[in-house]
């Protein structure tokens, strides 16, 4: 019987262990940041251990980084975490993309941009959205702090192999509908746990037609479907993206092997989901997890359980309302889901020559210094600033309430991030997940509108 893409990469990295039991995997790349690494480094010190493979360990600063004055960190905990990573990186010989570095940015942007993320690798990071790197045909997954320490010490992890789930996406995306809408729709239809226990391979003509940046958006949110892993078959678009990047020095030696990374025709999946996106609409979340979402023209659903009741109460909304009824106050363009150059380009087309609605606070946070530089070379910063957006420095920013960028209590925010949990963007913040185009249009109109009627 043939193998799936996931099986091929997994089996190549098994050092010991039987099928159906925990197996010891070799880890090719370990990405770290300031939040989940301090205790792991301290664990090495307490046991008088060295970092096993500093050459396979790369660090960046992202979660706590201010996006206005990056060298003036007022929060004591944030400042301590940042200075601790700087100290640890120096002590243990880890390459750190430090504050102000041309390569600094959100960890799941830095990996691909530098060429560290490559097909066929096993990649881990102490962050939930590590599956982003699966868009390159890698097995990439988030780990906890104790596992971070285990990788530090051994460059391995014990893992139990998951089942295989194929999501076959076909049809041409309508104008004004994007990769973000695909993954939001899937989660709204099948729930936040339909991928639990599975590695999801996204396949089909629609996936193959997407840019690498759009593919990363989909894999980024696999965890929101309950899946630890999300991946896609690497192809010529993947190889072109990786080629000539700083850490892709092995490109010529590796590309033939990368071309073998595909699911065999006779491979069997444990579950298959099919989605035709021909008539897909822009998506908007109304509640407090990504499953609580609707197509733009669909009324919010009836209350089915206590979770729905609590979500409506927290969000200040009612069944039967529509996205256009939401009283927005903030718009956030950023995060590891949608802060890449193509995201900012698409949003800039919508806001060019227009003005942010007077009641809206609109913020653009490029996901990395590289994206910021490229965007400014294209004049995107001027387009956004002329329209009334704030143009910030790179970082995780308003995706999570761990830095100064937070949504005020009770305020609704159109956000291009990946999570809309209670308090995710600040105490009492009300988050609505949308595509960059939807967020940009909302900033101008002061409310959600059907972006299909707005896109250039």
Curated annotation (Swiss-Prot):
Pfam families: Aconitase. GO terms for biological process: L-leucine biosynthetic process. Its EC number is 4.2.1.33. It catalyses: (2R,3S)-3-isopropylmalate = (2S)-2-isopropylmalate. Signal peptide: none annotated. Keywords: 4Fe-4S, Amino-acid biosynthesis, Branched-chain amino acid biosynthesis, Iron, Iron-sulfur, Leucine biosynthesis, Lyase, Metal-binding. The keyword Translocase does not apply. Catalyzes the isomerization between 2-isopropylmalate and 3-isopropylmalate, via the formation of 2-isopropylmaleate. This is 3-isopropylmalate dehydratase large subunit. It comes from Staphylococcus haemolyticus (strain JCSC1435).
């Amino acid at each position: 019987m043939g193998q799936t893409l996931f099986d091929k990469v997994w089996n190549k990295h098994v050092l010991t262990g039987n099928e159906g039991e925990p197996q010891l995997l070799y880890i090719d790349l370990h990405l770290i940041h300031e939040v989940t690494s301090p205790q792991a480094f301290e664990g090495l010190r307490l046991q008088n251990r060295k970092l096993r493979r500093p050459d396979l360990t790369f660090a960046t600063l992202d979660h706590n980084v201010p996006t206005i004055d990056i060298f003036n960190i007022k929060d004591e905990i944030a400042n301590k975490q940042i200075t601790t990573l700087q100290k640890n990186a120096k002590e243990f010989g880890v390459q750190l993309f430090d504050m102000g570095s041309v390569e600094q940015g959100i960890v799941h942007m830095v990996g691909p941009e530098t060429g560290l993320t490559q097909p066929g690798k096993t990649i881990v990071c102490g962050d939930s959205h590590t599956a982003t790197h699966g868009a390159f045909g890698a097995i990439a997954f988030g780990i906890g702090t104790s596992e971070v320490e285990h990788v530090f010490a051994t460059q391995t992890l014990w893992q139990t192999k998951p089942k295989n789930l194929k999501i076959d996406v076909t049809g041409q995306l309508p104008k004004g509908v994007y990769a973000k809408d695909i993954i939001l729709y899937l989660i709204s239809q099948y729930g936040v746990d339909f991928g639990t226990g599975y590695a999801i391979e996204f396949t089909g003509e629609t996936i193959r037609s997407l840019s690498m940046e759009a593919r990363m958006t989909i894999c980024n949110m696999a965890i929101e479907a309950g899946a630890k892993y999300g991946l896609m078959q690497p192809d010529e678009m993947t190889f072109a993206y990786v080629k000539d990047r700083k850490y892709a020095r092995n490109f010529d030696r590796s590309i033939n092997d990368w071309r073998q990374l595909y699911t065999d025709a006779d491979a069997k999946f444990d579950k298959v989901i099919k989605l035709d996106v021909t008539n897909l609409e822009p998506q908007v979340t109304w509640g407090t997890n990504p499953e609580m979402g609707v197509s733009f023209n669909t009324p919010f659903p009836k209350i089915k359980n206590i979770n729905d009741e609590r979500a409506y109460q927290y969000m200040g909304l009612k069944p039967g309302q529509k996205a256009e009824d939401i009283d927005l106050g903030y718009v956030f363009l950023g995060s590891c889901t949608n802060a890449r150059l193509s995201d900012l380009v698409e949003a800039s087309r919508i806001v060019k020559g227009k003005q942010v609605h007077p009641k809206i606070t609109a913020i653009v946070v490029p996901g990395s210094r590289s994206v910021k530089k490229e965007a400014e070379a294209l004049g995107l910063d001027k387009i956004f600033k002329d329209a009334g957006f704030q143009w910030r420095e790179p970082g995780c920013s308003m995706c999570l309430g761990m830095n100064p960028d937070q949504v005020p209590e009770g305020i609704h925010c159109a956000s291009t991030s990946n999570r809309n949990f209670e308090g995710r963007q600040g105490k009492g913040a009300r988050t609505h997940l949308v595509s960059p185009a939807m967020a940009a249009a909302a900033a101008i109109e002061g409310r959600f509108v059907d972006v299909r009627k707005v896109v250039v």
